[in-house]
Amino acid sequence: MPNNNSSNQLLVPGVQQALNQMKEEIASEFGVQLGPDASSRANGSVGGEITKRLVRQAQSQMNGYTK
């Protein structure tokens, strides 16, 4: 899979491989072939699911955190 050359920079060094693995796993679960030939809707569904899972993970890690 080609690297994304967007201006977005990852805040945690070395996390790109884990994100790519998550992307591939979700695409497989959804039956989506990622890439330029896939529809925007199909590619977007994978990106949306990644976001949902990362937010859920962050919320569970923050559970019980108070100021």
From Swiss-Prot:
The gene is Su-2. Belongs to the alpha/beta-type SASP family. InterPro entries: SASP_alpha/beta-type, SASP_alpha/beta-type_CS, SASP_DNA-binding, SASP_sf_alpha/beta. The keyword Lipid metabolism does not apply. One of its GO terms (biological process) is sporulation resulting in formation of a cellular spore. It comes from Sporosarcina ureae. Pfam families: SASP (PF00269). This is Small, acid-soluble spore protein 2. One of its GO terms (molecular function) is double-stranded DNA binding. SASP are degraded in the first minutes of spore germination and provide amino acids for both new protein synthesis and metabolism. SASP are bound to spore DNA. They are double-stranded DNA-binding proteins that cause DNA to change to an a-like conformation. They protect the DNA backbone from chemical and enzymatic cleavage and are thus involved in dormant spore's high resistance to UV light. Keywords: DNA-binding, Sporulation. The record marks 25-26 as: Cleavage. The keyword DNA-binding applies.
